[in-house]
Amino acid sequence: MKKIYTFIVAACMMMLAVSCQNEQAVTEAVSEEPQINTTMEDLLTRRSIRQYTDEMPPMEVIEEICKAGTYAATGMNRQSPIIIAVTNREMRDRMSRLNAQVMGNDNDPFYGAPVVLVVLADKNVHTHVEDGSLVMGNLMLAAHAKGLGSCWIHRAKEVFESEEGKQILAELGIEGDYVGVGNCILGYVAGDYPEAKPRKDNWVYWVK
């Protein structure tokens, strides 16, 4: 009788172990799927935002977004871009003024956003524009994933080719042959989040 009891206990323990392993496998599979779905959702729901509140996002959030930018793909992993993360109001307004001068008006080209992430890249690397553009994409997607709005603002190239733009780089201690790729503005969205416009019909040409 004692042997039968021992056998039953051992069998129950084996069944419990198998059940736990199966449950863990199911849990891992379920936990992986939402992550994939969330990534796709972020890709499909990100929008360019042109209306912001004055509220400054937490520094740790900005740092995480910058980190995402550093993981963008670059040609032969040369990592030619750099990011200037501007949260200082005086510098932000200075860059806004320079950008507006290039644009030819007095409006704020940063749409009131409190944060500007300037992406530059080493022009001696032949993939510098592509590298910097991928960084910009990562920054905007990461901002959306963190609940912030973003927008790619052009004219970084012209700003940092100007004498004052070069002076800013010198003041920041940045040396090298860097060319501006883009300004990623960040902040909390003011007003309604914009809806996506319809996609054009001839986006993809299949070759099967």
Predicted features by range, described:
Residues 5, 18-208:
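Acidic, surface-exposed loops and disordered segments
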